[in-house]
C-alpha cells in the first residue's frame, strides 16, 4: 500500500510533512499506545479517554494508509483485528521520546512558576 502522504500536495518543509502525517489530537497518542505491543481496537479505545469509535477508526485508517500502522485481520468468529506499528511507524519513537522529555521539562517549569 502506498503511503497517503504521496497523494497529498507536497509539503514545503520536513516539519510540515511530519505534521501532515502525525498531526492532530489523536495520532501521536495512538502511536504511543502501540509502541509497547500489538493492540486490539477495544484496547486502544479504552486507553484513549475521550476518543469516539468513529474517530479511532478514521485515525487508524489514515495511519494505515500512510504506512505507520499494520492492521491484521484474523478470520474467526467473532472477528479479531489487531493493530501494530510498521517499521516506519517505529521510527517515530525518538520523536515521541523527545516530546515526552520536552513535556516533562515544560510541566516542571510550570509547577516551579506557581506561587
Model segments located where?
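N-terminal intrinsically disordered/low-complexity leader segments
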Residues: 1-10
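Catalytic cores of transferase enzymes with a strong primary signal for eukaryotic protein kinases
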Residues: 2, 47, 59, 106-113
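N-terminal helix-turn-helix DNA-binding core of bacterial DNA-binding proteins
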Residues: 9-54, 75-76, 82, 113
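Basic amphipathic alpha-helical segments that dock to polyanions
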Residues: 56, 60-63
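Basic, amphipathic "hinge/linker" alpha-helix immediately C-terminal to the N-terminal HTH DNA-binding motif
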Residues: 75-99
